[in-house]
């Protein structure tokens, strides 16, 4: 929280503090609606003109016992005047809807931050379920923060006493009281919040009305008891945002939109063959809503079928996609290799999660990098891309589709649970401004001279002939093919040639140069990362630069092939540290690709994003060595 200036606004004894940024964390039981409250608050903030970055954090259990520590769900929102790169390490305002939430989440609140609690949920039975040893949780936890205690449950019950709703339904509205109070504390747009609720519950107007009534009660509560609250806050707007229309979007939705845009640009139908798996399922759900845009989705019987059906769709002339997470990629690998052998365009989306095996389904890691690069039998090169942020998922999904279509190859797109579920303010692009996509469809005049594996001499990719094109009938399959003719072949020299041709095609796909941020010319330390860690590494870079350290950042989004200038960039610096959410997979890969460099490592495998403060501490230690 960066204070810009302070002033009294004259509405009471409280002081309104003007801020450049502010972080709110909603927490409660998994059924308390913390994700909804956080999403509405982030959307309202984006509508107001602020930049945002969010972090939904929920347990891997389908439903832990109510009121227990293992069942706590949280949603953190970082609102800023200027560009916000991370959800923040700790919050300025914590909402704890019960005793368990306070016990597990207070450590995420800054020492000077405030905590809102529902005092009705701190009874003896609640404290016992939350594993307290005394009847004074504040003292037991050593909390020194300002506590805003509110009887939220009682107020909500009174508010909806005449609604005709049952008790369970009434209690589901508690999150809106907390949201209303937060909106008052931060001078947020209540009308925008109400409109979101009306839209969400459009088919249940009584539910919408109840939630809006409770939302207003929370806001009014703040107005009526302002004398007991030390500060209210207002995050300023007017930062250096590009003009245009913005929306609050999470990474999975942005990925879906990027794929739709690519299909539109290429003039193709979009096909998704998928099997539900956390945290990738929302891509399937989102694409299923857009049949009117030429999108076909099939929820298949298993992961293998999802990928195999997508290969079939690619043969049929569609932009073909299959979506999953790490465990699903294990199952899809043979079908992915079928796309390698047949040289058909396919986008394989891996929304990475904690592993191995079932692992941590709702948590984030980057541990599938080497799987994406090498996790198939045989010499099976695939382009591998990694999105850097929730909004970047749109552009990298579009780019993955473009590369797949133009170079007739399967492409792996890596995102992760953090950026897939987190959100940011997305500037909606015009379709005309996006790069052209030109699939290499066989032309009518090639009839007679065409063969199934005839290649474009410039790109090395074969031409795309689809069923129904007279004179271009052919078959494909997983057995090795003869060069050009596509006939089955076991001849040794032909296998070597085809292996080399497939590798050459992928290795020579043009990708943008690797850019360096920070003290690019005279840095003593270069930080290297990839994918969804960009925001945290960028924030750590800013912190180090502000203290006079000579550091730079090179963040990879194109992993295979690497940018042509990668070796040249890395060799400029005396020291290079690779920071990643795994045991060192990118560092190992770079050692294979770039000789003569000692790569230092900063690795974390906790199922959580990086902490900016810990990154700064670690990089400072490396600098001081």
Residue ranges and their predicted role:
Residues 2-266:
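Active-site cofactor/cluster-binding pocket
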Residues 21, 158-160, 227-244, 262-269, ...:
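Gly-rich Lys/Arg/Thr-decorated short loops/hinges at beta-loop-alpha junctions or inter-strand turns
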Residues 21-109, 257, 271, 278-374, ...:
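Thiamine diphosphate
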Residues 22-29, 178-180, 270-273, 320-323, ...:
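Short glycine-rich or small-residue beta-strand-to-loop segments that form or flank ligand, phosphate
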Residues 58-59, 214, 235-239, 275-279, ...:
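A glycine-rich phosphate-binding loop feature that marks nucleotide/adenosyl-phosphate handling sites
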Residues 59-63, 122-126, 155, 304-306, ...:
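Short gly/pro/ser/thr-enriched loop/turn and capping motifs at secondary-structure boundaries
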Residues 88, 143-145, 149-153, 363-412, ...:
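Conserved thiamine diphosphate
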Residues 248-258, 266, 396, 401-625:
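Flexible, low-complexity linker and terminal segments
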């Amino acid at each position: 929280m960066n204070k810009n200036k302070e002033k009294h606004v004259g509405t009471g004894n409280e002081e309104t503090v003007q801020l450049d940024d502010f972080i709110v964390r909603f927490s409660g039981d998994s059924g308390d609606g913390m994700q909804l409250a956080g999403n509405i608050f982030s959307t309202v903030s984006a509508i107001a003109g602020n930049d945002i970055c969010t972090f939904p954090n929920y347990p891997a259990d389908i439903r832990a016992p109510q009121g227990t520590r293992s069942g706590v769900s949280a949603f953190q929102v970082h609102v800023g005047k200027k560009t916000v790169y991370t959800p923040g390490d700790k919050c300025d305002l914590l909402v704890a809807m019960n005793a368990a939430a306070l016990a597990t989440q207070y450590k995420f609140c800054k020492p000077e931050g405030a905590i809102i609690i529902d005092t009705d949920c701190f009874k003896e039975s609640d404290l016992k379920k939350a594993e307290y040893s005394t009847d004074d949780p504040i003292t037991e936890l050593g909390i020194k923060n300002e506590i805003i205690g509110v009887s939220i449950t009682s107020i909500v019950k009174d508010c909806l006493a005449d609604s005709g709703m049952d008790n369970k339904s009434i209690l589901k509205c508690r999150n809106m009281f907390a949201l209303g109070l937060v909106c008052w504390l931060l001078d947020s747009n209540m009308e925008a919040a109400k409109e979101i609720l009306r839209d969400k519950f459009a088919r249940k107007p009584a539910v919408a009305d109840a939630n809006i009534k409770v939302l207003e009660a929370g806001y009014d509560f703040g107005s009526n008891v302002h004398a007991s609250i030390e500060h209210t806050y207002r995050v300023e707007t007017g930062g250096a945002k590009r003009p245009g229309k913005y929306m609050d979007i999470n990474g999975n939705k942005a990925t879906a939109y990027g794929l739709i845009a690519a299909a539109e640009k290429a003039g193709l139908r979009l096909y998704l063959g998928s099997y539900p798996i956390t945290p990738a399922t929302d891509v399937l759900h989102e694409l299923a809503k857009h049949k009117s845009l030429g999108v076909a989705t099939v929820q298949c019987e298993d992961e293998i079928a999802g990928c195999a059906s997508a290969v079939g769709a690619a043969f049929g002339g569609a932009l073909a996609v299959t979506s999953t997470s790490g465990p699903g990629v294990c199952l899809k690998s043979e079908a992915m290799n079928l796309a390698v052998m047949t040289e058909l365009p396919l986008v394989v989306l891996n929304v990475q999660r904690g592993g191995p095996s079932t692992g941590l389904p709702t948590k984030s890691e980057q541990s599938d990098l080497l799987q994406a690069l090498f996790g198939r039998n045989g010499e099976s090169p695939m382009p591998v891309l990694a999105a850097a942020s929730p909004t970047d998922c749109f552009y990298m999904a579009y780019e993955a589709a473009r590369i797949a279509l133009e170079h007739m190859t399967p492409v792996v797109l890596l995102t992760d649970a953090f950026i897939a579920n987190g959100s940011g303010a997305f500037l909606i692009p015009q379709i005309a401004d996006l790069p052209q996509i030109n699939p290499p469809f066989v032309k009518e005049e090639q009839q007679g001279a065409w063969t199934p594996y005839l290649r474009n001499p410039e790109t090395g990719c074969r031409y795309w002939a689809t069923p129904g094109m007279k004179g271009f009938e052919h078959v494909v399959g997983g057995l090795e093919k003869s060069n050009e003719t596509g006939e089955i072949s076991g001849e040794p020299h032909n296998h070597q040639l085809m292996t080399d041709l497939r590798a050459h095609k992928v290795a020579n796909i043009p990708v943008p140069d690797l850019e360096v941020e920070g003290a690019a010319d005279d840095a003593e330390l270069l930080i290297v990362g990839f994918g969804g860690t960009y925001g945290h590494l960028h924030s750590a870079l800013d912190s180090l630069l502000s203290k006079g350290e000579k550091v730079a950042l090179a963040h990879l989004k194109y992993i295979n092939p690497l940018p042509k200038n990668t070796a040249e960039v890395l060799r400029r610096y005396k020291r290079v540290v690779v920071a990643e959410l795994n045991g060192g997979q990118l560092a190992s890969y770079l050692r294979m690709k770039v000789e003569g460099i000692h790569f230092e490592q900063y690795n974390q495998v906790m199922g959580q994003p990086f902490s900016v403060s810990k990154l700064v501490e670690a990089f400072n230690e490396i600098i001081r060595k």
